[in-house]
Structure formats: structure tokens, C-alpha cells
Amino acid sequence: IIGDTINGAITTADNIAGKIGII
């Protein structure tokens, strides 16, 4: 499902950014 893939990628990127301290 394209929508799930895009949402998953955004969530993963947000989690990584949060761990680094960007967000």
C-alpha cells in the first residue's frame, strides 16, 4: 500500500530526527 509506505518512511525519519535532536 503506497500510503502506508509513505507514512512509514515519514514516521521512521521523524523518529531518527528526534533521536538526533533535530525535532
UniProtKB/Swiss-Prot annotation:
Keyword Phosphoprotein: yes
Record family assignment: Belongs to the Frog skin active peptide (FSAP) family. Septenin subfamily.
Function summary: May act as an antimicrobial peptide.
Keywords: Phosphoprotein, Secreted
Subcellular location: Secreted
Keyword Phosphoprotein: yes
Entry protein name: Septenin 2
Tissue expression per record: Expressed in skin glands.
Main location: secreted
A GO term from the CC aspect: extracellular region
